[in-house]
Design a protein with these regions (language model features):
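A short beta-strand micro-motif common to beta-rich folds, especially ectodomain repeats
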Residues: 28, 103-114
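Short solvent-exposed strand-capping/beta-turn motif centered on an Asx-Ser/Thr pair
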Residues: 19-21, 31-37, 99, 114-116, ...
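Short beta-strand segments of immunoglobulin-like
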Residues: 12-17
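Low-complexity, Pro/Ser/Thr- and charge-rich linker/hinge segments at domain boundaries
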Residues: 127-166
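Surface-exposed binding patches on compact interaction domains or structured appendages
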Residues: 1-10, 23, 27, 33-92, ...
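C-terminal edge beta-strand
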Residues: 119-128
């Protein structure tokens, strides 16, 4: 692992910057230093802005390594384990509403395992006044497109706006006014 990770004494704190409307993604690292770490589980608290009382609800967070929605729309849990001596990045995401007040939101993420003690990380997320376009998808470094892994778009027969459905009359198919 990088020396910086060892030299830094703060292994229990995460600080991030985000914009309103952003699908905010961050990573936590699990290092299996002495033995395998089996069946990781990630729990979230709400993040609370102490100045306004507003919250980013715990239910809005997901850890892509341990849970998701499959191609049929079925919610699943996934076993995520780390071999001895290895590091596993845990990818976490949450949708920040556009109407969220700017300020600092604080809460916790707790990572537990079947065979190791739990570790709680204090999370502090500073939300700016800026409202980001397209949830941040135009800036690939934000990794906001990870939310697409759990997308339920396309599970029904409805056409997604701004597209219009094909029209069939007898043996003729029409699309956007053309036959």
């Amino acid at each position: 692992i990088p020396y910086k990770w060892i030299a830094d004494n703060r292994h229990d704190f995460f600080y991030g910057q985000a914009d309103k409307g952003e699908y905010y993604v961050f990573q936590l690292g699990v290092w299996a230093a002495r033995s395998n770490v089996e069946n990781l589980h990630v729990d979230f608290s709400a993040l609370t802005n102490k100045a306004t009382g507003e919250q980013i609800p715990a239910s809005s967070f997901t850890c892509f390594n341990t849970e998701g929605t499959d191609v049929t729309g079925t919610v699943f849990e996934k076993n995520c384990s780390v071999d001895k001596g290895k590091v596993q990045a845990l990818w976490v995401g949450t949708q920040l509403p556009e109407h969220l007040s700017a300020g600092t939101y604080q809460g916790t993420v707790t990572v537990s395992a079947a065979n190791a003690e739990s570790k709680t990380v204090q999370v502090s997320l500073n939300v700016s006044e800026n409202v980001i376009a397209n949830h941040g998808d135009n800036e690939p470094w934000r990794h906001s497109r990870l939310r697409w892994l759990n997308s339920q778009i396309g599970f029904d027969d409805e056409v997604i706006a701004p597209y219009t459905p094909l029209v069939m009359k007898d043996k003729t198919i029409s699309c956007l006014g053309r036959e």
